[in-house]
From Swiss-Prot:
UniProt-annotated location(s): Cytoplasm
Annotated protein name in UniProt: tRNA N6-adenosine threonylcarbamoyltransferase
Stated role: Required for the formation of a threonylcarbamoyl group on adenosine at position 37 (t(6)A37) in tRNAs that read codons beginning with adenine. Is involved in the transfer of the threonylcarbamoyl moiety of threonylcarbamoyl-AMP (TC-AMP) to the N6 group of A37, together with TsaE and TsaB. TsaD likely plays a direct catalytic role in this reaction.
Obligatory cofactor(s): Fe(2+)
GO molecular function per UniProt: iron ion binding; N(6)-L-threonylcarbamoyladenine synthase activity
Signal peptide coordinates: none
Residues that hold substrate according to the record: L134, A135, S136, G137, G138, D167, G180, N279
EC assignment: 2.3.1.234
Major site of localization recorded for this protein: cytoplasm
Taxonomic placement: Bacteria, Pseudomonadati, Pseudomonadota, Alphaproteobacteria, Rickettsiales
Enzyme class: transferase
Species this protein is from: Rickettsia bellii (strain OSU 85-389)
Length: 341
């Protein structure tokens, strides 16, 4: 049975996973760096890279032990090779290449975004094509997933990623890092209609998004307040999250229009992937929104929304099955669009 070892190190989570050709996740070890970055309330690239270097071997040993697998049983090694914080990407890629060379196993460079894009095929085995909303700390885009390595970006943020907006607003409210889950938790206790925030380019008639102005509006409000208490924090979090939901709901309908123009898709599946996909409020909102238009919204389990190596291993499996191996002289990339794969 084929077993793929996946490595993920593009940001602040060190992860190693082993999956089988039957899409069974035998192990998916994630070593978080939240404590290392907590004081900075954001990811420090140099600290992240050093932590990946210190944690990768430990994560691999745990993955092998948990899956009851030896290195000799590994069929191929897949690693995130971009986009991402280049220090961490290089650490993970070089680790994978070294294993590939020593074990004489194929190396497969995986685009981190492709890993997110294909997660629903790992978990739900959905067919191509489908519409994807990739929403994370570094990216926010609508993508037509037409096949393996065949992606068309329909629209994207013109400034900040939606996950970045969550984290920055959390920082403004002095909430712990990572901020996204903290905003969601506080929003449950607040009034989503308390503060009216702008929805930049919501009526632009395309699939592009903007979150910078929203972030600025939140900062302006906070600076205007004489005091900040828990009630105010909860109301700001709820109003901010509500506004994000309004923007994404509007734009996903625009994306459906464009998607239907370029594909004869009768599956009518929409996938939301990336860290923001773990937000339960947005899951329910977008699910109801798309259901009205005859689409099913699919989102991975929470553990597979955030960065993980299982999705990298699965992307590696699809590439292995199609004979798409990578030479060891492949250079990791800080920037790497899905359309450039």
């Amino acid at each position: 049975m084929k077993k793929i070892l996946g490595i993920e190190s593009s940001c602040d989570d060190t992860s190693v996973s082993i999956i089988t050709e039957d899409r069974e996740i035998l192990s998916n070890i994630v070593i978080s760096q939240n404590t290392e970055h907590a004081d900075y309330k954001g990811v420090v690239p140099e600290i992240a890279a050093r932590s990946h270097l210190a944690n990768l071997e430990k994560a691999m040993k745990q993955a092998l032990l948990e899956s009851n697998t030896s290195l000799d049983e590994i069929t191929a090694i897949a690693a995130t090779s971009g986009p991402g914080l280049i220090g961490g990407v290089i650490v993970g890629s070089m680790f994978a290449k070294s294993l590939s060379s020593v074990l004489n196993k194929p190396f497969i460079a995986v685009n981190h975004l492709e890993g997110h894009a294909l997660t629903a095929r790992l978990t739900d085995n959905i067919p191509y094509p489908y519409l994807l909303l990739l929403a994370s700390g570094g990216h926010c885009q609508f993508v037509a997933v037409l096949g393996l390595g065949k992606y068309k970006i329909l629209g994207s943020t013109i400034d900040d990623a939606v996950g970045e907006a969550f984290d920055k607003v959390a920082k403004m409210l002095d909430l712990p890092f990572p901020g996204g889950p903290k905003i969601e938790k506080r929003a449950k206790l607040g009034d989503p209609y308390k503060y009216k925030f702008p929805k930049p380019i919501i009526n632009s008639g395309d699939c592009n998004m903007s979150f910078s102005g929203l972030k600025t509006a939140v900062r302006t409000l906070i600076m205007s307040l004489q005091e900040i208490n828990d009630t105010i924090i909860n109301d700001i979090a709820a109003s901010f999250q509500f506004t994000i939901g309004e923007i994404l709901s509007s734009k996903i309908l625009e994306a459906i229009k464009v998607y239907e123009q370029i594909t004869n898709d009768f599956n009518r599946n929409i996938v939301i992937a990336g860290g923001v996909a773990a937000n339960k409020y947005l899951q329910e909102l977008l699910s109801n929104c798309t259901k009205i238009h005859g689409y099913q919204l699919i989102y991975p389990p929470t553990t597979l929304c955030t960065d993980n190596a299982a999705m990298i291993a699965y992307a590696g499996l699809e590439r292995y099955n199609n004979g798409l191996f990578t030479p060891l002289n492949f250079c990791p990339k800080a920037r790497w669009s899905l359309e450039e794969i």
